[in-house]
Amino acid sequence: AEQNVNVTDTSLKLAAIATPITNAPLSNLGLVVTEERFIFALGSGGNSRKISWCDREDRNQWTPASTNEAGDIELQTAGQIMQAVRTRGQTLILTDVDAHTARYQGPPYVYGFERVGTSCGTVTSRGAVDTDRGVFFIGQENFFLFNGNTVQTIKCDVHDYIFGDINTSQQTKIWAMGIPQYGEVWWFYPSANSI
C-alpha cells in the first residue's frame, strides 16, 4: 500500500493543522529519526528506493552542501523501502526484499550504507521492533532477527500455523510490538478468514 508521508511541523500546544516543512521532500513512504538526530525521509519524493536526510537538528535544511550534513542516497536494491528502525548505533532499513544499515560516519558522506541481508524483506511498514537482543521483524515466509551485524532466520514452533493463517492480501496491515518485561515480541496479523 502506497503511503504519502510528509515532514510536518506540529506542536501539541497549538490547535493547528500540520503543514509540510519548507524544502522537505514530499510523498515519502515513512520517516525515522536517527540516533544522531537526523530525519530520514524514506522513499523520498516518491522514489521507493531513495532516502533523504536533513542537516542535523535542522528540519528545514534538506539541500546537501559543504556547509551542512544534509544528503540523500538511492539504495542499491530491487525492492522498495518498507520501514526503518533505530538500533544500536545504526539505523536498520528494511525493503520488501532485503535489509540495509545506515551508519553515521561524518562529512563528507555523512552516512555509510551497507546491505546486511538478502531474501529477508518485510511485508509491512509496522512489522519490526527493536529490543535489547536486536531488531525482530516479519517477512513473507519467516521471522527474522537483525543482531547488529547480520540478519538471521528465527526458528519458530508456530511458524507453519502463523504463515499458513495470514491473509496475504492484507499482510501490509501486520504490526509488531515489544513486551520488554517478558522478553517477547508480538505480531498482530489479519487471519486467512478475515476480509
Language-model regions, residue ranges each:
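Short Trp-Ser/Thr-centered turn/loop motifs at beta-strand boundaries
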Residues: 1, 52-54, 155, 163
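Disordered, low-complexity "stalk" and linker segments at domain junctions of extracellular
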Residues: 1-37, 43-45, 68
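Hydrophobic side chains in beta-strands
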Residues: 7, 41-42, 53, 101, ...
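Beta-strand initiation motifs
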Residues: 11-16, 60-67, 107-113, 152-154
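Intrinsic-disorder/low-complexity coil detector
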Residues: 19, 24, 63, 69, ...
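Carboxylate/His-rich catalytic cores and anion/metal-binding grooves
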Residues: 29-63, 77
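Beta-sheet-dominated scaffold domains
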Residues: 37, 77-195
